[in-house]
Structures are given as structure tokens and as C-alpha cells.
Amino acid sequence: ITRLKATEAMLIDAKEKAEESDRLKSAFLANMSHEIRTPLNAIIGFSSLLPHIEDAEERNHYISLINHNNELLLNIINDVLDLSKIEAGHIELSPVWCNLSDLIDESCTECQPNVPEGVTLKKRYPATPNLIKQDPMRIKQVLSNLISNALKNTVQGYVEISYETTPSETRISVSDTGRGIPEDKLGIIFERFEKADTFIQGAGLGLPICRSIMEHINGTIEVTSTVNKGSTFTVVFPCQVRPME
């Protein structure tokens, strides 16, 4: 009888996990359908207007909107492909000596057009920066996703990127003065099919990508947050460290 009960409990648990997986996949597909359809509709709609617009300024405005939605659509597709590739273990790491300050500078420059009015993008570096040996492309991917996530959730104040190194690891933090994350949502924000706020633009894949990359390089990602005050995301990963020459 005991064995039967144990088997029954295992079957019930497996059934519940399968149902939860199906629910998450359905939610993801519904969300992806919405996220992809939104920029597609804009591209199609504005493109259909262009042949009928003679005013150059108005025409350029619509072209700008089309380009913006092209980039949005491409980012969504890239996120889906990147996450699938990383989770399947189909990425190769290429560690090289790199300057983390430079990687942060590049990420901030790329994110600058998305900084809301009233928000300052700040950087805080060690007094004596070091070189780290890690895959710069993956570290930059994590940086870009964390910065973009912070900017989406901050309408006033700042987003600050800082880091510190020890002889064997690096710690990067991205802090913001945004809306914060409710405590009951902290456990789901790194799941690939979930978003803490469904009204925030994006497919909700940036943080899962960060988590997957960190797992791939034996690192960790954590978050602390207070509603209406802001959040801090911190990644820690092992790497070789040496002084800059």
C-alpha cells in the first residue's frame, strides 16, 4: 500500500508539472503572438501610408516609426533564438582578456537612445580597474539586457551600473529607482514564460537569457527590490583577473 501511495504521489506530481509546463507554454505563445503582432501591424500600417504622403517631414516621421518597429521585432526574434540556443547548450564560450569598463561603456552607449526623459544613466567603476578573462560577447549580452530591463521600469531618477573584482570573480550590479518588483513576483521573473508586469513592452526574455548565460559560465544572478523605490540586479561569475598594464 505504501508503495502504491508513493507511486500515486509521483504520478500526481508529474501530472501537475506537465500541466504547469503546458500553461506556461500557452502563456508564452499568447504573449509572443501579441509582442510580434504589435510591431508587425505598425510596420504594415505605416508602410501602406507612405505612398500617399507627399510632405517630406511627415514621410520621414513614418519612416522613423517603421525603423523603430523593425528593430523591436528583430530584438524579439533574436531573444527567442538566443535563449533557445543557450538553454540547449549550443553556444561556445570564447574567454579573452577584456576591459569590463569598456564593455559597460559600449552597452550604455547602445542603450542611450532608450533612456527616458528624467532618467540618468550612471556608471561607477573601481579606482583601479582590472582586466577580466571571460567571453566579452556574453557579458555584454547580460549587461545590455539588465540595463534595458532597468530602463523599461524607470521613469524618474537613475539607472546605475557598477562592478568590483576579486582575484577569482567579478560582481556586476545594475540598480534603478524604478517601480520595483512585488515580493510575490520575485520568484518568477527569471522564468522564460513569465513577466512581472504584463504592461511592460517586451517578450519577457531578457532576464531568462541573463540567468541562462550565468548558469553556463557557473555564475549567479540575484535581485533585491522594493516596490516604488527600485531594484538591484547582481551577477557574480568566476574569472581570472589581472591588473591593467
Model-predicted segments: where are they?
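Conserved catalytic submotifs in the C-terminal HATPase_c
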Residues: 94-99, 118-130
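Short alpha-helical segment of the dimerization/phosphotransfer core of two-component systems
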Residues: 68-73
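Short conserved segment of the HATPase_c
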Residues: 181-193
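Short alpha-helical Gxxx[C/S/T] motif in the catalytic ATP-binding
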Residues: 206, 210
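Helix-loop junction within the histidine kinase core
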Residues: 84-95
